[in-house]
Amino acid sequence: MPILGDATVIAGLLSRSTSNALRVQLTTPDGTELAHAQQKGGAAVLLGFKNGGKSDYTLSSAAGEELRIAVAGTTTITNQNTPLGRIVPSDGAARFEDGGGTVLAVGQPLTGFKADSAWHHRIMSPAGQELGVLTLMRAHTGWRDIEEEAYQLLLNYNVTSLKAPSYGALLKLSAPVPSQLGDVLAAACVDFSVLPRGYIA
């Protein structure tokens, strides 16, 4: 079962569990949870020393599917130890690849300025067609730049006492995407939020 299904607007809301592990909830504008990712625990996480950056996450869909995301310079995504995809930095941008290295889509460098509270990255198909935009929320005010429908997601957004690496991510697609690309983009919402990853030309 694909994680995104037919959803075209997905918010990745970043919070913490009681054990201090980062948690990213992927929801639609009406509040439906598509999946949630949980950082692998440990003493460094519990004590607040591992606050984002390179780490392992489990992305669990509402249908029970689990993906493992190893967030790093090149992020790998696996499904039951089978490579599903990778997020690879490339020329100031990112490639979204399948498990065999075939490019599914490309994330372009941010449009705007480094000081912006929201960094917008256009997502293009290998043929150059725009598929959507993945936005990294660098500040709480970044959500204000988003249209009202998606901004409603912020109403239930909790700001934790331990500073988070970002304020989440928003994925807006022009149309539903194939399931494999959808799963990689769901993982990208986690990756962008917790690394936090932004691409600058």
Feature names for model-found ranges:
Residues 55-83, 89:
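Hydrophobic/aromatic-rich structural module bridging two neighboring secondary-structure elements via a short loop
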Residues 1-56, 82-83, 91-93, 99-201:
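Low-complexity or membrane-interfacial segments used for flexible interactions
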